Amino acid sequence: MASKTKFRGSYTALVTPFKNGSVDEAAFRSLVSWQIGEGVHGLVPVGTTGESPTLSHDEHRKVVEWCIDEARGRVPVIAGAGSNSTREAVDLAVHAEKAGADAVLVVTPYYNKPTQEGMYHHFKTVNDAIGIPIIIYNIPSRSVVDLSVETMARLFELKNIAGVKDATANVARVSLQRHAMGPDFIQLSGEDMTALAFMAAGGHGCVSVVANVAPKLCASLMSAVLKGDYATGLAIQDRLVPLHAAIFKEPGLAGAKHGLKLLGRLDEVVRLPLLPVTPPTGKVIRDAMVHAGLLN
């Protein structure tokens, strides 16, 4: 039950820019600075959207360090520290803490399909190794396992477990988790399209892919609903819905990078086995950005 009051609002799941086969530090730092200037409430480097599966561990650590250094304490940084190897997750989490991260995001172990008890011990081992908050990342569509509400409740008894990034897209989970763990258990939506409904059910914020492209709009939506102004939130959502759909027509990180390319902020290079979006999807993304008022 870690201190978790600051984890509210719109947290951008940052893309990782590449240039000439390497991570582009200058472009990444520029992205971080722009995001903060646009009013985002927090940053999440090297998660799924940051292409963590195709980063080396050295690259992963450098991106975390650059993000923390560039943020300079202006917004919280929740560093990705997930792995399907508990030992690797611990190593990444320990590094993130030493680098100055405010919290770590730890995904449910993917591919090896652990039991609920196995997942409990995975998170407990990370919990016991560090002294900063841990946000559980529950994403059954990618991990093939779903951390149950009951297991989350057990984990919330540990000192550093602060909440969940819930990418189930099942809004009912928000109410079930709120009932089981109470309102202090931080619930961050991991789905842009359902984030407004997620907040209405008791959520605290969103870890957003679309915020890469529309940071000010995403932050404004979250700020409005956190104040109970759902009319304003819905009006902003109406502007963003086509963009939510467009960015995820193909892998979301590729869609986000294409949107950032259209804004002139970075190249859309991704690492295999992912590819840049196709021209038809690129047109849909552009049209959606025009609808949102991001492009003329």
Curated annotation (Swiss-Prot):
Pyruvate binds at T49, V207. The keyword Phosphoprotein does not apply. GO terms for molecular function: 4-hydroxy-tetrahydrodipicolinate synthase activity. It is found in: Cytoplasm. The active site is at Y137 (proton donor/acceptor), K165 (schiff-base intermediate with substrate). Keywords: Amino-acid biosynthesis, Cytoplasm, Diaminopimelate biosynthesis, Lyase, Lysine biosynthesis, Schiff base. Catalyzes the condensation of (S)-aspartate-beta-semialdehyde [(S)-ASA] and pyruvate to 4-hydroxy-tetrahydrodipicolinate (HTPA). Homotetramer; dimer of dimers. Belongs to the DapA family. This is 4-hydroxy-tetrahydrodipicolinate synthase. It comes from Nitrobacter hamburgensis (strain DSM 10229 / NCIMB 13809 / X14).
